[in-house]
């Protein structure tokens, strides 16, 4: 990895500002990654094990706050950043909120502080697309897909930073969840300082207007891309992160070392897939077939989960989930940007992220609905496995949409 990053830097001739944005994103995402996957486990773990002892319903409410806030702020962030012609300030605000929320959890862990922490993570996650636009604006229109692929390396580095921290905090019978939130605050403070070295890309062109919105929707395939984004984000967030950690711990009795590194096992193939999607597959087989390839990879993982009750196949099979999401997200985010000029990407990405956030919210919220509507499971599968059966159906619908409609519209 240390050799790969200098290679990318040299190959694409990244300047100082591009490198700073990249490393800022690594730290920014590390502050989230350290705690994001452990929200649900912290909430449902018994108090004698360091948790808060909440019910599954309360835990689902906490995790779904992440997506709920995203639904409200993703589009306004892009509109405001376009109006003020600034993006860095929003990243700084997000880091401040995350630091404050993490410190509150450390000082007084409760439903309210953990809920606020989840909201703060959702605010920060909404900045992912801001980073993508900020980074893509330093590239030409033709290299939008390449910029997305380069930036996709950062989350993997964040996972490598977070994994040993997560293991050291949770390997014992008593889990030191507070330490995770304390380190999240520390990393976020370092990232906040680094933001002052980033240079915003400003335009003299006309800023936000409804003419820009109209221009975006004049591209007839754009809304269809957004609809697929809802499904892809639902698929991802209902079967990974906090939900996967909780499922693996409670249902599969996965050991702490595996739990700590399971997100790395997701992020590494996600990185490979993200790079290959923009630099190889899209050129060889086309963007719609590349998207289908990614969704097919997701499908392999869901079938593995449905067929096994052992943690090892689930752990190893998680590679397919990461690879599939890496391809799917890169394809969708590239399509949401590459058909528009630089000054229009804020609007196109903001609308896209609004749709994407809906899937994030429902991906967490679905666990609350399942616990209430199908307490005994679905079609012979117990309650916690039923989500994977539902996701199989949604993935098949997404594949059909990608295969038969995108090519027709774009």
Predicted regions and their residues:
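Helix-loop boundary and gating motifs at the non-cytosolic
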Residues: 4-67, 224, 234-252
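C-terminal membrane-cytosol helix-exit motif in multi-pass small-molecule transporters
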Residues: 166, 185-204, 398-406
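Juxtamembrane intracellular "pre-TM" segments in multi-pass secondary transporters
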Residues: 1-18, 200-227
């Amino acid at each position: 990895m240390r050799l790969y990053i200098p290679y990318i830097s040299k190959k694409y001739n990244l300047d100082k500002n591009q490198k700073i944005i990249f490393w800022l994103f690594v730290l920014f995402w590390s502050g989230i990654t350290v705690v994001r996957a452990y929200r649900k486990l912290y909430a449902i773990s018994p108090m004698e094990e360091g948790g808060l002892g909440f019910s599954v319903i309360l835990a689902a409410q906490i995790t779904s706050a992440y997506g709920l806030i995203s639904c409200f702020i993703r589009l306004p962030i892009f509109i405001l950043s376009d109006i003020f012609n600034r993006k860095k300030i929003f990243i700084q605000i997000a880091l401040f909120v995350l630091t404050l929320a993490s410190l509150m959890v450390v000082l007084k862990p409760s439903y309210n502080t953990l809920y606020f922490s989840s909201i703060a993570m959702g605010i920060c996650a909404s900045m992912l697309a801001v980073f993508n636009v900020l980074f893509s604006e330093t590239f030409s229109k033709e290299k939008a897909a390449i910029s997305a692929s380069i930036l996709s390396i950062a989350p993997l580095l964040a996972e490598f930073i977070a994994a040993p921290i997560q293991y050291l905090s949770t390997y014992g019978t008593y889990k030191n969840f507070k330490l995770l939130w304390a380190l999240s605050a520390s990393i976020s403070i370092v990232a906040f300082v680094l933001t002052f070295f980033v240079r915003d890309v400003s335009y003299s062109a006309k800023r936000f207007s409804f003419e820009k919105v109209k221009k975006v929707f004049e591209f007839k395939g754009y809304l269809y891309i957004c609809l697929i984004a809802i499904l892809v984000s639902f698929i991802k967030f209902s079967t990974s992160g906090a939900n996967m950690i909780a499922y693996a711990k409670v249902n599969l009795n996965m050991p702490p070392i595996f739990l700590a590194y399971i997100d790395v096992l997701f992020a590494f193939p996600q990185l490979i897939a993200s790079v290959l999607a923009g630099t190889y597959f899209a050129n060889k087989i086309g963007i719609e077939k590349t998207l289908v390839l990614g969704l097919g990879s997701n499908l392999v993982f869901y079938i593995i989960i449905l067929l096994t009750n052992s943690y090892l196949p689930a752990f190893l099979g998680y590679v397919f989930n990461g690879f599939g999401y890496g391809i799917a997200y890169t394809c969708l985010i590239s399509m949401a940007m590459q058909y528009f000029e630089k000054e229009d990407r804020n609007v196109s990405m903001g609308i896209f992220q609004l749709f994407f956030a809906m899937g994030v919210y429902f991906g967490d919220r679905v666990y609350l609905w399942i616990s209430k509507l199908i307490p005994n499971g679905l079609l012979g599968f117990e309650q916690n496995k039923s989500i994977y059966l539902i996701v199989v159906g949604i993935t098949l619908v997404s594949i059909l949409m990608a295969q038969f409609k995108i090519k027709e519209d774009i």
